[in-house]
């Protein structure tokens, strides 16, 4: 974020990206750059999807800054670089600025850094930022070790500072939508302070590299709907403090082919008028479960629409919201009543479910139509219990845990609700969902 801020301060238009499936980090990029950050994930989007998103987003920008995911070489498995920051860098031909953590290390830090540089010669590490420096003496030892061993220039030296620590929760950072204006201003102030310890001119020099362009961008057509009818379809999307896990690309893909209107399961009384479909994304319904419980009107409205076969697509937090209840961690006796479309309960646990998923659709007769496989990811601390055994499951997982025993996606009427998060750029999920909404509209 400091690099994004520093480039912006020099007058450059910065397009931020987050490598990997994370929903929260991009909201911090937005606060710094005032531009919508986009995710780049090879597993979710495919190579073509990466180029499509990247090239489209950077058309009017001077610089693209990509925040990595986990360690440089961490991806789908330990066998290769697939889906890692290094892999993404190789696809787009982007240089890497390596940030190394100096806590409890000095000369050893040089050995670790040298290992990163030599681990994969195809990866272009062009600059190093040393983070979490304890003191001037600590820095002196580090520089002495780097001097004879590391040829890549050090372009940033950042000292430890408790004031720079960001607020966290069980799934990581707290989404900026939940933060007060003061907290967001502090994030920007911290980025400003840290940027002063980075050689932004050197960043500019490193960043002036040519990006590969292997793409002829073409929108996927919806063959079964006349273009004149597309703007008649309205899809309502849940968006508030409880539900805000959406990829920017997904929203834009829907917007190209249908009208969208946002609503709040916390504050809205009904789904927007003339809606033909509903999307309820992920988020933190457990945090504000009491407010969701108290909005009886919207819950009743959603349940009635679902029972009348309105297409509804829900992921993770949306799945939890559509069950009978949500119980918080260490207080499972208190059940907050939710929509109750699916006869099951959600409880929060202390155990993290995290990883990429691969799913096969069990039927072509759902709102997602005839899709062979779906790539996604799951990231949650909740668990579905006491589910009615008669509930149909939309997906069988080749990879991942899902709701129960390698199956995911509760399916009822025209609704699918899964733990799996998906990206629309590399699949026909959005087109098939819009077609389902069109059929509903015509009834």
What is the predicted function of each stretch?
Residues 18-19, 154-162, 261-267:
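Beta-strand->loop->alpha-helix junctions that form or flank phosphate-binding loops
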Residues 15-17, 97, 234-236:
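Conserved beta-strand elements of the Class I
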Residues 65-67, 97-99, 129, 279-281, ...:
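Structural motif
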Residues 223-307:
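Phosphate-binding active sites in nucleotide-utilizing proteins
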Residues 5-92, 100-127, 136-140:
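ATP-dependent carboxylate-amine ligase catalytic core
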Residues 30, 227-231, 243-253, 261, ...:
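C-terminal and late-domain segments of enzyme folds
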Residues 106-226:
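Internal gly/pro-rich beta-alpha loop/helix module
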Residues 285-367:
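Cysteine-nucleophile active-site neighborhood
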């Amino acid at each position: 974020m400091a690099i994004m801020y520093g480039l912006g301060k020099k007058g450059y238009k910065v397009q931020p990206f987050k490598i990997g499936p994370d929903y929260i980090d991009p909201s911090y990029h937005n606060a710094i750059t005032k531009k919508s950050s986009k995710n780049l994930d090879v597993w979710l989007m495919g190579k073509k999807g990466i180029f499509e998103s990247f090239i489209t987003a950077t058309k009017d920008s001077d610089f693209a800054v990509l925040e990595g995911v986990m360690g440089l070489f961490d991806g789908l498995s330990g066998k290769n670089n697939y889906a890692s920051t290094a892999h993404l860098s190789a696809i787009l031909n982007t240089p890497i600025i390596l940030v190394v953590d100096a806590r409890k290390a000095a000369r050893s830090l040089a050995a670790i850094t040298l290992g990163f540089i030599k681990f994969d010669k195809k990866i272009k590490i062009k600059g190093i930022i040393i983070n979490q420096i304890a003191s001037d003496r600590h820095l002196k030892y580090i520089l002495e070790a780097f001097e004879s061993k590391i040829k890549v220039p050090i372009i940033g030296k950042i000292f430890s500072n408790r004031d720079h620590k960001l607020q966290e929760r069980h799934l990581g950072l707290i989404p900026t939508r939940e933060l007060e204006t003061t907290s967001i201003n502090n994030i920007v102030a911290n980025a400003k302070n840290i940027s002063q310890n980075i050689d932004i001119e050197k960043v500019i020099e490193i960043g002036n590299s040519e990006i590969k362009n292997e793409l002829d961008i073409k929108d996927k057509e919806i063959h079964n709907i006349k273009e004149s009818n597309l703007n008649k379809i309205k899809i309502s999307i849940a968006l508030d403090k409880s539900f805000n896990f959406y990829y920017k690309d997904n929203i834009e893909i829907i917007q190209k082919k249908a009208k969208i209107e946002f609503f709040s399961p916390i504050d809205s009384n009904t789904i927007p008028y003339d809606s033909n479909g509903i999307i309820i994304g992920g988020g933190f319904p457990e945090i504000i479960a009491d407010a969701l419980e108290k909005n009886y009107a919207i819950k009743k409205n959603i349940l009635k629409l679902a029972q009348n076969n309105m297409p509804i697509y829900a992921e993770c937090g949306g799945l939890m919201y559509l069950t009978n209840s949500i119980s918080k961690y260490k207080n499972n006796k208190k059940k907050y009543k939710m929509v109750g479309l699916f006869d099951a309960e959600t409880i929060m646990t202390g155990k993290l479910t995290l990883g990429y998923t691969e799913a096969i659709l069990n039927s072509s007769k759902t709102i997602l139509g005839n899709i062979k496989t779906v790539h996604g990811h799951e990231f949650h601390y909740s668990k579905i219990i006491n589910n009615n055994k008669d509930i149909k499951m939309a997906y069988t997982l080749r990879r991942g845990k899902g709701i129960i025993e390698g199956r995911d996606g509760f399916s009822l009427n025209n609704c699918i609700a899964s733990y799996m998060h998906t990206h629309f750029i590399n699949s026909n999920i959005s087109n098939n969902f819009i077609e389902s909404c069109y059929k509903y509209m015509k009834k």
